[in-house]
């Protein structure tokens, strides 16, 4: 082998040139391979960690002004409200080419009466009582008039007597009927600040018109109710045995149940919930739903950390959920977002009766979730709410067609679907082809991929660069190897003939010719690999994919945890490549060297001397 190396050193310039070229080609080849493997690992990690969620909202056909009377101002007020000519079903999104990972779903939520658990702090009872009262004098209640409370139907109170004075006003009626002294009346009231001039009390009990049922059938149609929209009724002998009297008792019963009501959201997959998708909600203790839980409808649930702490609940405890109402219109956040329980639907059915449970079961707590930003967001803009229970949708095995408290169009917080990452343009093209224009103009689809498009773009560019480096290194290494073997083996036939003439065996000739070339190549390959490792470490410190470019700080973002995981994702096989590639190149050099030497040894000595 030493003689072989000495022969190489007889042409130092050529040997040095091939050595440096082989070193550079190997460095380029290994660097390209490492970058390719590293980038591919990051792409795979991004594909696993990121999802693309689409949300759907039906736009109103128009808005109309709803007017009402304000007795304190002595004038009408106006409020804009949306008008929908019809409700578009989520089924219109089932079209060719959609390629859903998870098909569109319009989520409903249940109302559960949690007797014995802390749900709210009595807001409804304090500000929306049902009162029996007797006027101190006959008067028209277009201003605050003094009355004596006979009793509260809701909330029930101890030691009720007629010495309790309050001031009532038929605040929202332009020409109210008079209240007569000595008679007893019952009314549903709202405690508000008294803005009347010369008011004798800082607060007043504003009379509220009778609740008209918002119950809908299974097709989403509003059921007719014969309730008269009066703000009060006179209480006479036997009044509560009449249909009108039963209304007040049922309303009081429903309001009492409402005080202990919490929302329950049935889940088919937490990946379809926008708050779980954007990581503003995540399970911090216990576990989330398994695929088996969701498919089999296991009686398990997730509750908020705050609710569990407030009620002394922990993982493994069971909570009974009597479900009595179904809201197919809004997300739980619209009513329960801040915990106040202010409703946009009636608690009475079309027969003016309180709803009764259609499904009751005990659910085991398997995890508690932490929620960021439930407060302070516009009502109904997200699906999460205070005291919200999450349960598998398949766990409710009863028909609830008779308990639908409201129905309405698709909203971003209630309707979502999932598509493969990077296919938003393909989806919208199929959507525009297959969904009629008159439907599309009334729907608004919004996508959120959590920054996947920006991150994957940089990674794909980096992979393209890595492939180019790898290809350039591979072609360069092969070309240099061919030239190396040509000059130091193929062109050495005369040398082989002389060595054979001097009595060297064929094996000795093989060693003489090939060993030096193999050693030279091996050393160059090793140095090139070392150089590529240093370069690879330097490249990893650079932001070549643009992942770190932000227009805002993510230091305190929940999503930043996952972004960092992607940025620091290492390919498990980069170390293997730094061994396999040099070894393969060395073996290839040795193999080709032996093949070429054997080919030369087939010639006769005289023939080789003439080469």
Summary of predicted features, one role per range:
Residues 14-72, 531-540, 544:
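Alpha-helical transmembrane segments
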Residues 37, 41-107, 163-167, 176-184, ...:
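Basic-flanked hydrophobic alpha-helices used for secretion and membrane insertion
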Residues 4, 484, 571-611:
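C-terminal membrane-exit region of the final transmembrane helix in multipass inner-membrane proteins
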Residues 535-577:
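Short juxtamembrane loops and helix-capping segments at transmembrane helix boundaries
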Residues 1-30, 514, 602-604, 610-611:
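N-terminal Sec/SRP start-transfer signal
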Residues 90, 105-141, 147-151, 367:
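Structural detector for short beta-strands of small beta-barrel domains
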Residues 13-40, 457-497, 517-535, 581-593:
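Hydrophobic alpha-helical transmembrane segments of multi-pass inner-membrane transport and secretion
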């Amino acid at each position: 082998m030493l003689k072989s190396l000495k022969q190489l050193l007889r042409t130092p310039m050529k040997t040095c040139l091939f050595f440096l070229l082989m070193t550079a080609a190997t460095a380029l080849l290994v660097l390209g391979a490492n970058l390719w493997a590293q980038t591919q690992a990051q792409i795979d990690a991004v594909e696993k960690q990121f999802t693309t969620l689409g949300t759907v909202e039906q736009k109103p056909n128009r808005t109309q002004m709803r007017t009402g009377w304000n007795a304190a101002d002595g004038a009408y007020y106006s409020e804009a409200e949306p008008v929908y000519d019809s409700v578009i079903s989520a089924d219109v999104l089932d079209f060719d080419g959609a390629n859903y990972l998870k098909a569109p779903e319009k989520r409903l939520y249940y109302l559960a009466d949690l007797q014995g658990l802390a749900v709210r702090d009595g807001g409804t009872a304090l500000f929306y009582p049902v009162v029996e009262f007797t006027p101190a004098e006959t008067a028209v209640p277009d201003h605050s008039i003094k009355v004596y409370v006979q009793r509260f139907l809701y909330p029930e109170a101890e030691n009720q007597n007629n010495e309790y004075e309050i001031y009532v006003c038929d605040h929202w009626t332009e020409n109210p009927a008079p209240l007569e002294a000595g008679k007893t009346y019952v009314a549903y009231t709202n405690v508000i600040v008294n803005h009347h001039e010369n008011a004798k009390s800082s607060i007043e009990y504003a009379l509220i018109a009778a609740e008209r049922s918002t119950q809908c059938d299974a097709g989403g149609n509003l059921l007719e109710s014969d309730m008269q929209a009066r703000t009060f009724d006179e209480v006479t002998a036997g009044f509560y045995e009449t249909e009108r009297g039963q209304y007040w008792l049922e309303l009081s019963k429903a309001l009492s149940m409402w005080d202990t009501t919490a929302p329950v959201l049935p889940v088919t997959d937490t990946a379809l919930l926008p708050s779980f998708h954007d990581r503003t909600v995540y399970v911090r203790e216990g576990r989330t739903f398994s695929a088996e839980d969701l498919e089999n409808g296991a009686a398990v649930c997730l509750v908020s950390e705050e609710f569990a702490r407030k009620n002394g609940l922990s993982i493994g405890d069971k909570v009974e959920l009597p479900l009595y109402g179904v809201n197919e219109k809004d997300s739980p956040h619209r009513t329960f977002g801040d915990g106040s329980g202010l409703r946009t639907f009636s608690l009475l059915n079309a027969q003016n009766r309180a709803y009764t449970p259609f499904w009751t079961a005990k659910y085991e707590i398997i995890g508690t979730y932490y929620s960021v930003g439930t407060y302070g967001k516009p009502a109904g803009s997200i699906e999460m709410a205070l005291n919200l229970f999450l349960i598998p949708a398949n766990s409710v095995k009863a028909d609830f067609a008779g308990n639908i408290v409201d129905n309405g169009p698709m909203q971003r917080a209630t309707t979502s679907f999932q598509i493969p990452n990077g296919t938003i343009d393909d989806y919208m093209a199929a959507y525009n082809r297959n969904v009629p224009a008159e439907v599309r103009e009334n729907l608004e689809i919004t996508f959120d991929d959590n920054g996947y498009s920006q991150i994957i773009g940089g990674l794909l560019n980096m992979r393209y660069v890595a492939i180019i480096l790898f290809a350039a290194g591979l072609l360069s290494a092969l070309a240099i190897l061919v030239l190396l073997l040509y000059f130091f083996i193929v062109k050495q036939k005369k040398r082989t003939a002389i060595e054979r003439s001097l009595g060297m065996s064929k094996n000795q000739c093989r060693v003489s010719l090939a060993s030096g070339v193999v050693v030279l190549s091996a050393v160059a390959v090793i140095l090139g690999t070392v150089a590529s490792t240093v370069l690879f470490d330097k490249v990893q410190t650079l932001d070549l994919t643009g992942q770190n470019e932000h227009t805002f700080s993510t230091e305190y973002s929940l999503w930043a945890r996952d972004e960092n995981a992607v940025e620091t994702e290492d390919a498990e096989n980069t170390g293997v490549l730094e061994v396999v590639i040099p070894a393969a190149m060395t073996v290839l050099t040795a193999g080709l060297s032996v093949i070429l030497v054997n080919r030369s040894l087939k010639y006769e000595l005289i023939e080789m001397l003439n080469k």
